[in-house]
Amino acid sequence: MISTDAVAPAVDVKGEAGDRAATGNIFLVGMMGAGKTTVGRLLSHFLEKTFYDSDREIQKRTGVSIPTIFEIEGEEGFRRRETEILSELMNARNIILATGGGAVLSGVNRAMLKHGGTVIYLRASIDDLWRRTRHDKNRPLLQTSDPRARLAELFVQRDPLYRETAHIVVESGKRSPRHLAQSLAQQLTISSRTG
């Protein structure tokens, strides 16, 4: 069992993240099931920014589901498409983008995100992630004989990359998405004013 007891403070703003959030882009990173899409939509409403979800953008452009892309092109093909979408969205302004859980696997993606806006890592425990994803058949990486163990492996692999990329780390497990988004919006607004 992976211990997730030692977690970051609820909101930890580093450096000029608040300034970037007030005028620029906000990118949400984290594991599948962390709440990126739900919190991102709410945060976009509170901060009056346009919301995008990279997985949905890929689906809109290809006309097929993520599992179908994995089946036809493999994970490598999907990751290539993900990088293309991220690269295009880096030209946008005043957006909130929920990235796919594996977006941080690419060093190119990590650099684009880190330098293109404020990166918020929505972190949740393995138990919370499992509870949110265990019945979702649209998660190709969890279609294994032991999906919970696979989720734990992905967490161990990706957590350091999320932390490396993020300007802000937020525990998303125990608060409602609305409360979390309100708290983030307030903190980002305060940080941009006191910068």
Curated annotation (Swiss-Prot):
ATP binds at residues 33-38, 139, 175. Pathway: Metabolic intermediate biosynthesis; chorismate biosynthesis; chorismate from D-erythrose 4-phosphate and phosphoenolpyruvate: step 5/7. Its cofactor is Mg(2+). Coiled coil: none annotated. It is found in: Cytoplasm. InterPro entries: P-loop_NTPase, Shikimate/glucono_kinase, Shikimate_kinase/TSH1, Shikimate_kinase_CS. Keywords: Amino-acid biosynthesis, Aromatic amino acid biosynthesis, ATP-binding, Cytoplasm, Kinase, Magnesium, Metal-binding, Nucleotide-binding, Transferase. Binds 1 Mg(2+) ion per subunit. GO terms for biological process: amino acid biosynthetic process; aromatic amino acid family biosynthetic process; chorismate biosynthetic process. Substrate binds at residues 55, 79, 101, 158. Mg(2+) binds at residue 37. Monomer. Catalyzes the specific phosphorylation of the 3-hydroxyl group of shikimic acid using ATP as a cosubstrate. This is Shikimate kinase. It comes from Nitrosospira multiformis (strain ATCC 25196 / NCIMB 11849 / C 71).
